[in-house]
């Protein structure tokens, strides 16, 4: 059994990891909140929580792959480039890996919530609801990116609408994780 401070820290790191994933602020072509930092925070969270649920440890290799991908993309941005869009098959593999990683991560957090939340709380259901929304949004982004050539007249509107939904969903995900970590502080 993991102590409450470790659980609090693990959930906090994941919540802040989502901050780095959802808030991509650029100076020119370079992100000042790079996504790979978010992945490193997830990996740190996984390390802290792996004794609590075996599935956390199983996410580690995929987290490393995504961290390397995001770091490579961030380094390419310093040269004005990007890793996305050059190999469609590789983009698809990364999209699927990203969806699976986040789906499983939130599934594991919901399972932890069932174990630690107070009777009558519904943190687990809240985490699962936002997990599902995030998965749908990531799938929609992946599909519309593949269909960009056919949506050219509407592309700006489609990406703007998806960005707004994605941002709202991300804020809700982070708020759910920050609410979940309170379980460990109050105990």
Annotate each predicted stretch with a short phrase.
Residues 1-45:
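N-terminal topogenic module of multi-pass integral membrane proteins
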Residues 5-12, 53-64, 127-131:
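Membrane-interfacial loop-to-transmembrane alpha-helix junctions, especially the N-terminal start
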Residues 24-26, 75-84, 143-155:
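Juxtamembrane "helix-exit" motif on the non-cytosolic side of transmembrane helices
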Residues 43, 136-187:
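C-terminal transmembrane-bundle signature of multipass membrane proteins
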Residues 47-60, 83-84, 114-125, 185:
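Membrane-interface helix-boundary motifs at transmembrane edges
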Residues 55, 62-79:
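A generic, lipid-embedded transmembrane alpha helix
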Residues 83-94, 154-164:
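Non-cytosolic membrane-interface motifs at loop->transmembrane helix junctions
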Residues 107-140, 180-187:
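Membrane-helix boundary/juxtamembrane motif in polytopic membrane proteins
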């Amino acid at each position: 059994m993991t102590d409450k401070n470790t659980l609090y820290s693990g959930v906090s790191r994941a919540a802040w990891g989502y901050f780095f994933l959802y808030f991509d602020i650029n100076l020119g072509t370079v992100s000042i909140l790079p996504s790979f930092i978010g992945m490193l925070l997830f990996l740190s969270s996984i390390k802290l929580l792996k004794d609590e649920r075996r599935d956390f440890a199983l996410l580690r290799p995929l987290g490393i792959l995504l961290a390397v991908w995001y770091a490579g993309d961030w380094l390419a941005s310093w040269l004005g480039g990007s890793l996305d869009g050059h190999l469609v098959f590789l983009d698809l593999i990364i999209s699927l890996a990203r969806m699976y990683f986040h789906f499983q991560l939130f599934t594991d957090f919901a399972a932890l919530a069932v174990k630690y939340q107070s009777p009558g709380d519904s943190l687990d259901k809240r985490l699962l609801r936002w997990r599902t929304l995030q998965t749908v949004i990531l799938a929609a982004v992946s599909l519309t990116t593949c269909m960009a050539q056919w949506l050219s007249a509407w592309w700006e509107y489609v990406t703007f609408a998806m960005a707004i939904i994605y941002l709202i969903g991300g804020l809700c995900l982070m708020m759910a994780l920050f609410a979940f970590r309170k379980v460990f502080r109050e105990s």
